[in-house]
Design a protein with these regions (language model features):
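Active-site-proximal, well-structured secondary-structure segments within enzyme catalytic domains
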Residues: 261, 265-267, 314-328, 590, ...
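Active-site cleft segment of glycoside hydrolase catalytic domains centered on the general acid/base Glu
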Residues: 285-289, 315-357
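Feature activates predominantly on carbohydrate-active enzymes
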Residues: 2-16, 25, 33-35, 78-309, ...
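Substrate-binding groove of N-acetylhexosamine-processing glycoside hydrolases
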Residues: 1-22, 29-33, 60-61, 301, ...
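Short, charged N-terminal beta->alpha structural module
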Residues: 20-51
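Active-site-proximal loop/turn and secondary-structure-junction residues that shape catalytic pockets
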Residues: 150, 190-192, 252-256, 317-319, ...
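Short, well-ordered secondary-structure micro-motifs within conserved domains or adaptor modules
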Residues: 25-26, 54-83, 101
Length: 701
């Protein structure tokens, strides 16, 4: 069997391998002259992680296997229709020659990528398995959604890929293309990671942050600026992506966390209902204020001018209330049956304004929305028809239902909007992991009592949605990749199942690890990834601040499973260390060094969190005040140990509060506040620290 992902549509493996070679000669005689150098350069760049292999003009060097490039798929039988012609390819690898056929540039890129993936080391050279492949995607637009900035200034400053510069983004682009992904929907929430001259206060520049100085054992206040503001690399990155027929979309708010405008101008926020307990009034601005809409339109115009190919506009997740100012009540509130309906109507009005503004800059820009995600999750067909009639006919949907509803709900949306307008679903498991303070969550097995967990988003659910999306023939998939290090399995799943594979999940995870790490090491890596048990600190019973992304509260019935994880930990950690040593010794695996550093840190934290969780359960069972106090001391001790490991590795670890509400993705600070209040009710600290402001819109779960 060919070890190849994404899984090709048709592949025949013939016995044996090519002769050994150190170079591939790219025969471009059949191409028009202007394309020859471009395609040769594309081929060279596609071998970004195979530098020791030369990509040369045909016949250009010794030890060379010749690849004849034919820009035509005529007489190649395939049932892929237009997608075969747009992005498909044909490869025939014989003992001494390669034939590569394609119709369009994307097909050439996909074919060269497959060729690279098939390479086997052979002494001081390489060989390819003898094979014939005819391949094409089932889904045209295969996107991932990474984070360029995420709630910056609102809930955090930045972590993981949000701290990258050009070189890291270029490597990630290459990883995407290796997985035959052809689009990024780059999240930009909070302070803008680009210059907006009309509104400089909204730009991600000189934001104060306290960082841990291990040398002196104290906090230092520094001012942080987004890497793209420092180096202005975004235009070059978009241009590089376009060389590979790769689209870059802006994933921004539809009146939701647009720049730092509602931070710097709190008077522009929506007006909460009088006397309500709602905490998040900083998400959106009042749409009856002309200055606010002017700001939003100026932001969208600027993003269009930066060269993005399209927009993913996300509607606010706050669906329980809507602006209560007199003008918003008059325009939308009084003609709606609920706050969420008023929000939809106001946002559709804004969407039409944005549509015109963006198209005035780029008439070809794709404009899509992520909307209608709040209860009721099963929509009335009449409501969907009204939505269709209220927006331009070419608006794409980057969210369509899947979870928490019966399968018929997806078909209902397809019937209402048309499959060509659906570009994404609820494949957000990686985004859920990214809320958890750098802990590890990929599989069902990483969670305690998964079957009881209200939030079901794990890689298994993402795969199911990709498979059914491909079966229904929708236009696109959108796999969330809000966090990269340690979470590579999500990327592989988005690539494989977005391409149209129906492979068994267990076979996919086994094969993907074997391809990446080799047969023996791959087995060990997969065992580690599936054996990690992650308890989020908020699952301790005394923790009162809602955290909807891992909601099960621990009980004494969970003690045996926690004890098993405790016993497993030393062996698991040593295996992680052994894997790290092998990766560090192999230049071909160097790209995984940071991934396993993150996994190692998460597993060391897990061991501490197990002890803290058990102490919290002892506290719940304690009868005497003395016992309770002793267990609270234990919890605080382990809380400090957990945070010491956080400080050891991560940058953005303290609450941010510019909005007027404190937020931090690490529960450490809120644990201290809660225990202080338990011990000192006469002097309470009332400034709650939410575990990421993204949690506030999910409290319905």
């Amino acid at each position: 069997m060919l070890k190849l992902l994404p899984e090709p549509k048709r592949a025949v493996e013939n016995r044996g391998y090519t002769t050994s070679f150190r170079n591939i000669g790219i025969g471009l005689e059949a191409l028009p002259s202007p394309e020859k150098q471009e395609y040769l350069e594309i081929a060279r760049m596609r071998f970004w992680n195979r530098k020791e292999l030369g990509i040369v003009p045909e016949g250009g060097s010794e030890g060379c296997i010749e690849a004849t490039i034919i820009p035509s798929l005529a007489n190649i039988e395939a049932d892929g229709g237009d997608l075969f012609l747009k992005q498909g390819y044909y490869l025939n690898v014989d003992r001494d020659t390669i034939v590569l056929k394609y119709q369009n540039k994307a097909g050439f890129i996909n074919a060269i990528t497959t060729l690279k993936q098939l390479l086997k080391k052979n002494g001081d050279g390489f060989a390819l398995p003898l094979c014939e492949i005819t391949d094409w995607p089932t889904v045209e637009h295969r996107a991932v959604a990474p984070t360029f900035s995420w709630y910056a200034g609102y809930g955090r400053i930045g972590f993981d890929m949000q701290l990258w510069g050009y070189d890291e983004w270029l490597e990630y682009l290459n990883v995407c293309i290796d997985n035959k992904i052809n689009q990024m929907n780059m999240v930009m929430y909070g302070y803008w990671p680009f210059e907006l001259e009309e509104y400089p206060e909204t730009v991600f520049r000189d934001v104060p942050i306290k960082i841990w100085n291990k040398e002196n054992g104290r906090w230092l206040t520094v001012r942080y600026t987004h890497p793209n503001i420092e180096d202005h690399f975004l235009a070059d990155f978009i241009a590089m992506a376009h060389k590979f027929d790769f689209s870059i979309f802006a994933y921004v708010g539809l009146n939701s966390y647009n720049g730092a405008y509602s931070i710097k101008h709190p008077e522009k926020r929506m007006v909460k209902p009088a006397g309500s307990g709602f905490m998040n009034d900083f998400d959106s601005v009042c749409l009856s204020d002309g200055e606010n809409t002017n700001y939003i339109l100026a932001s969208m115009r600027k993003i269009s001018e930066l060269g993005f190919d399209g927009f993913t506009l996300e509607e606010s997740e706050e669906g329980f209330w809507f602006c209560n100012c007199d003008r918003c009540n008059e325009r939308w509130g009084r003609v709606s049956s609920s706050p969420v309906e008023a929000k939809h109507k106001a946002n559709l009005w804004l969407l039409n304004l944005i549509y015109k503004e963006v198209r005035s800059v780029n008439s070809k820009a794709v404009i899509g929305i992520r909307a209608y995600r709040q209860p009721p999750l099963e929509k009335d067909p009449a409501f969907l028809r009204e939505c269709v009639e209220s927006m331009p006919k070419d608006i794409a949907l980057f969210w369509a239902p899947a979870l928490y509803v019966p399968p018929t709900e997806f078909k209902k949306w397809i019937a209402a909007f048309g499959k060509e307008r659906i570009w994404g679903r609820d494949t957000e498991a990686n985004a859920i992991t990214s809320t958890m303070g750098r802990l590890f969550r990929v599989f069902e097995s990483n969670m305690i009592r998964y079957r009881d967990e209200p939030n079901v988003q794990v890689i298994e659910r993402d795969i199911e949605q990709h498979i059914t999306s491909a079966q229904e023939g929708v236009s696109g998939i959108n796999g969330f990749m809000f966090e990269w290090y340690g979470l590579f399995m999500f990327q592989w799943a988005h690539g494989n199942y977005g391409w149209g594979s129906k492979m068994d999940r267990d076979e996919f995870t086994r094969l993907s690890c074997e391809i990446a790490f080799g047969k023996e090491l791959g087995k060990r890596v997969l065992v580690v990834l599936k054996s990690i048990l992650t308890i989020h600190e908020s699952q301790m019973p005394f923790y009162t601040m809602p955290f909807p992304f891992q909601k099960n509260k621990l009980t004494v019935a969970d003690i045996p499973e926690i004890q098993q994880a405790r016993l497993r930990h030393p062996v698991l950690l040593e295996e992680i260390h052994a894997i790290q040593r092998e990766i560090e010794a192999d230049p071909d695996l160097a790209q995984y060094i940071q991934h396993f550093a993150r996994i190692e840190n998460a597993e060391r934290r897990n061991a501490v969190i197990y002890e803290m969780a058990l102490a919290s359960l002892r506290y719940e069972c304690a009868v005497s005040l003395e016992e309770k106090e002793r267990h609270l001391d234990e919890i605080l001790h382990y809380n400090e140990m957990d945070f010491d490991l956080v400080k050891e590795m991560f940058f953005d670890i303290n609450p941010v509060s510019e909005t007027g509400m404190k937020s931090c993705m690490y529960p450490y600070h809120e644990i201290k506040r809660i225990i202080h209040n338990m011990r000192h009710p006469e002097n309470p600290d009332t400034a709650v620290i939410c575990s990421g402001i993204e949690a506030l819109g999910w409290l319905w779960l």
